[in-house]
Amino acid sequence: MFRCVVRFGAKDIRFGTEARQSMLKGVQRAVEAVATTLGPKGRNVIIEQSYGAPKITKDGVTVAKSIEFKDPFENMGAQLVRQVCNKTNDLAGDGTTTSAVLVASIFSEGIKSIATGTNPIDMKRGMDRAVEVILKNIESQSRTVTNTENVVQVATISANGDVELGKLIGEAMEKVGKDGVITTQDGKTLTTELEVVEGMSVDRGYISPYFVTDAKTQKAELEDAFVLVSAKKLNNIHTILPVLNHVVRSGRPLLIIADDVESEALTTMIFNKLQGKLKIACVKAPGFGDNKAAMLQDIAIFSGACVVGEEGSGVELDAEKFEASILGSVKKATITKDDTVLLNGGGDVAMMKERVDLVRGLIERETSDYNREKLQERLAKLSGGVAVIRVGGASEVEVNEKKDRITDALCSTRAAVQEGIVPGGGPALLRASKALDGLLQDQSLTADQRTGVQIIRNAVRLPAHRIVANAGREGAVVVEKVLENTDAAVGYDAQLDRYVNMFEAGIIDPARVVRVALTDAASVASLMMTAEAAVVDLPKDDAPAAGGMGGMGGMGGMDGMY
């Protein structure tokens, strides 16, 4: 009989003020590195990598991800900064540096107040009230994106003031539409170029991260790939062995889009992929019910495949018999954890046109708003094409840095189209801070809640302050001058060192980026403030391993035992 013994490593625990101060140290050090990138005059950060040349970036989330401290409590603080940056990046695609600056300010002021006797729970209630007021004010300041010029302005700001990149992104969005797919690839020249290719997107990513081919970008990329489309779950490896054998013999990759892939089939595919015997990725079919069946048919027509297991189709996977004609093909498939982009499908052009016309007809006849919206999404994916930005540069370092900025700019642009724009460079939060003056006078607030409101009021003024400081000017003076101006659109242009109407000057931010940066920062900082203990692993002693046991009489050694 075997017995399993699990031993946990020794822990170090700190409580109260000591725990919070230790984490604060890590937060402040991490945020100082991230904050140097804020604004048009922000500086680059050079990051050592485990392989290749150092990475040069002005992207806040990239800097945050690279930071790790030797002290485990400081590292805990840095990890929380990384968490808020990642969350903001996932939800808004930009604003990570702003959220880092906010979280450091809220956490720092919060623990100072707690040390003087402020009730942390009441203080958090005050902070929550203040955040609500500011979000309403941000919403009232926002304007709808009405033209390509606004798109170019947002993209230019997020691309660190690069007008050419801003124009390129504006052109890409104009060609494929606001719901269209825009991707980046390494170019083969010194210039960055735009190309619109025939393609479609699928709102599902890889089933398992083991299918990733690029650990750095966490993407699976398959060139000149076969496509297998299945309306049924694939769980028996024997039924798809003929497909896998055909793919291995051809030397080409395989993309499987199926209702699901599980158990034995998934395990076998992952094992062979990791062994280098098979280039493969599996994606779960998008949509639900009838919509799922229709989208699988869209993918099949685009790629030239047959839908396996579709009711009435007569096409099934058979362990004894396999026809290569059931497989489709794409020139390239790029799969992330959230979505899949297919380029240059092998389907018949005439059938694709018929399919697009069919979906257009369904949209005209559809009476349900929900169903019409889903049909419009399908039409955009079928007919919109894919804009590919081929990023050029003199070196790999330059190309990667430019790709980071383009990714930020694309996310910001989509956010702006969806939720509108506000004055950029910090004045939106600055103006919103004045809306808290009325809340501070609210007699229903306790003294501790009022402290929470004041903490948020001070914090939301800091991003503008830091942008000005990075430009070499006195932050407090500029911030005060902006607040004195009665025109809500007026702010400070750090690039040209002057006060301008931010909308007219094209210095704008997506309202969603500002909203998400504040809510994420306030959420994480308030959780850190109310923590009363911090637990970390103690470093393990590097004691030498004990020598192996000699064999007993009549027995060999124990080297073969595992």
Curated annotation (Swiss-Prot):
InterPro entries cross-referenced by the UniProt entry: Chaperonin_Cpn60_CS, Cpn60/GroEL, Cpn60/GroEL/TCP-1, GroEL-like_apical_dom_sf, GROEL-like_equatorial_sf, TCP-1-like_intermed_sf
GO cellular component: cilium; cytoplasm; mitochondrial matrix; mitochondrion
Inducers of expression: By heat shock.
Chaperone as UniProt keyword: yes
Gene Ontology molecular function terms on file: ATP binding; ATP-dependent protein folding chaperone; unfolded protein binding
Transit peptide: 1-8
Subcellular location: Mitochondrion matrix
Signal sequence region: none
Pfam families per the UniProt record, alphabetical: Cpn60_TCP1
Gene3D superfamilies: GroEL, GroEL-like equatorial domain, TCP-1-like chaperonin intermediate domain
GO BP terms in the entry: protein folding; protein import into mitochondrial matrix; protein refolding
Key words, A-Z: ATP-binding, Chaperone, Mitochondrion, Nucleotide-binding, Stress response, Transit peptide
Keyword Chaperone (UniProt): yes
PANTHER family per record: 60 KDA HEAT SHOCK PROTEIN, MITOCHONDRIAL (PTHR45633)
Protein role: Implicated in mitochondrial protein import and macromolecular assembly. May facilitate the correct folding of imported proteins. May also prevent misfolding and promote the refolding and proper assembly of unfolded polypeptides generated under stress conditions in the mitochondrial matrix.
Family statement: Belongs to the chaperonin (HSP60) family.
HAMAP family: CH60
Name assigned to this protein: Chaperonin HSP60, mitochondrial
The species this protein was found in: Trypanosoma brucei brucei
